[in-house]
Amino acid sequence: MTITGKTKVAGIIGWPVSHSLSPPMHNAAFEALGLDFTYVPFPVAPERLAAGIAGLAALGVVGFSVTIPHKVAILPLLDRVTPEAELIGAVNTVAVEEGALTGYNTDGIGLLSALRSKLGFHPEGRSVLVLGAGGAARSAVASLGLAGAGRVEVANRSPDAGRCLAEAMRERLAGTDFGFQPLGQISDKGYMSSFDLVVNTTSVGMAGDAFAGLDLAALKPGACVYDMVYAPPVTPLLAQAEAAGVPWANGLGMLAAQGEAAFRIWTGAIPPEGCMEKALAARLTTPGNP
């Protein structure tokens, strides 16, 4: 594409940010729709965050994605935060309109979209086991609760973090039963048999490591497994699900779907179906990429 003085700019801030897969994903969608937009990475050091986002607003960018380590730190620097982002306690997308910055969190939208499209899973009234209690887990737990899940159980190595997450959501979302279980105590078949879905929100699996004692064969009939990890495309958790005959999906669909939601916020347009995910898959299979 040709960049001119009329080209609208979006981007992503992080530290570091050179590894991000978001630029090829968004630029593929801009090109497919013939939109005069471009998406670029902006490396912003933590101590320069306030100056960085003020500069982006002053330069007239339409919006930007937010990645590590800024998702929480950016909250007090925004003019407005959506209720879902406030509940999650993190922002991954910012829209800039007439100099005002609005923070969104599209991670939950991405997860729910991927669960529907990849696994045909709808959370309403269902029981879900979420592995992990970090930022990704908070997004998953909140979005599942907002979508009407009947029960969401958090399993984490650190009891304090897991218990705090469950208690925080219990206080805010009365319609869902939120609970906590130490990660080392979820191997009981009777416990596992109560779940319709297992979601891994941790980095376990990226380096070939696995969860010990997790019996996926004991899940409810018709249950499924979702792993937010997308590289490698089949983690040990997903290989275990395959061996147990449990439907599964990796995190590529979620990554694309949260990007599609951000794209709609900035442009008002809907990316062609599958465009962003195809761009991600192509980049991931390029030598030297994640």
Swiss-Prot record:
Pfam families per record: SDH_C, Shikimate_dh_N
Ribonucleoprotein keyword on record: no
Superkingdom of the source species: Bacteria
Keywords annotated in UniProt: Amino-acid biosynthesis, Aromatic amino acid biosynthesis, NADP, Oxidoreductase
CDD domains: NAD_bind_Shikimate_DH (cd01065)
Enzyme active site: K71 (proton acceptor)
Transmembrane stretches, start-end: none
Pathway: Metabolic intermediate biosynthesis; chorismate biosynthesis; chorismate from D-erythrose 4-phosphate and phosphoenolpyruvate: step 4/7
Any one annotated GO CC term: cytosol
Enzyme Commission no: 1.1.1.25
Catalysed reactions, as listed in the record: shikimate + NADP(+) = 3-dehydroshikimate + NADPH + H(+)
GO molecular function (one): NADP binding
Residues given in the record as NADP(+) binding sites: G132, A133, G134, G135, A136, M228, G251
GO BP terms in the entry: amino acid biosynthetic process; aromatic amino acid family biosynthetic process; chorismate biosynthetic process; shikimate metabolic process
Sequence similarity: Belongs to the shikimate dehydrogenase family.
General function of this protein: Involved in the biosynthesis of the chorismate, which leads to the biosynthesis of aromatic amino acids. Catalyzes the reversible NADPH linked reduction of 3-dehydroshikimate (DHSA) to yield shikimate (SA).
Record's subunit section: Homodimer.
HAMAP family associated with the record: Shikimate_DH_AroE
Name assigned to this protein: Shikimate dehydrogenase (NADP(+))
Species this chain originates from: Citrifermentans bemidjiense (strain ATCC BAA-1014 / DSM 16622 / JCM 12645 / Bem)
Gene encoding the protein: aroE
